[in-house]
Design a protein with these regions (language model features):
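Internal, well-ordered alpha/beta segment that forms a basic, Gly-enriched binding/recognition surface
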Residues: 9-47
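Short beta-strand/turn micro-motifs at beta-sheet edges
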Residues: 44-48, 122-125
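Residues forming anionic-ligand binding surfaces in small-molecule and nucleic-acid pockets
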Residues: 47-55
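Core active-site phosphate/anionic-ligand binding loop and the adjoining beta-turn-alpha structural block
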Residues: 58
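Phosphate-binding active sites in nucleotide-utilizing proteins
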Residues: 74, 79-80, 111
């Protein structure tokens, strides 16, 4: 895979990248490097809540016929391993999700595809004209409390369909 090094402006940190299967760039940042403190002014008083555990996974939406190339890219370049594939319902069709995980286990990606052009994944791919971040899922200790805190800060939350929790119970049983 080809590498890329863009031009950095004055006082900007140059960040190398690798060209992904679709021609987009995957930037490479040294672990623990504080790039944000160099390139951005951080607001004082912001704290990470104790019940925030980190990012559970990032979901990437992509064209159905490109997923094998993405799997090979993550396996070859970064040593990711395959976890599991599942089929997820969308109001307008089915989404097939294949999880891959980094060798250290701290990065998990869901590579999502759909044959239907009406699903949220397909609409996202069409809107952005290719693969891209579809959502980020965060892990927390107390989901209801975290939702209440986010609503107090952010205001609006997406409505939850009436059958959402019934579907979760049917799928996972008493594991909730």
């Amino acid at each position: 895979y080809a590498t890329w090094q863009g031009d950095a402006g004055p006082n900007e940190t140059p960040i190398p990248a690798i060209c992904a299967p679709d021609g987009s760039l995957v930037y490479l940042i040294d672990a623990g490097e504080a790039i944000y403190e160099r390139d951005f002014l951080l607001r004082d008083g912001l704290t990470v809540r104790e019940d925030y555990l980190g990012i559970d996974h990032l979901a990437l939406g992509m064209e159905a016929d490109s997923r094998d190339n993405w799997v090979m890219f993550f396996r070859t370049v970064f040593g990711f391993t395959l976890e599991h594939e599942q089929t997820l319902p969308d109001p307008y069709g089915l989404v097939r999700s294949l999880a891959v995980r980094s060798p250290q286990g701290d990065i998990r990606l869901a590579l999502n595809i759909s044959q239907s052009r009406a699903t949220q994944i397909a609409r996202s791919v069409a809107c952005y004209q290719g693969a891209g971040l579809q959502h980020a899922a965060f892990a927390c200790r107390d989901l209801p409390a975290t939702c209440d805190q986010l609503a107090a800060v952010a205001g609006h939350a997406l409505p939850i369909p009436a059958n959402y929790y019934d579907d979760l119970l049917a799928r996972f049983g008493g594991e909730l």
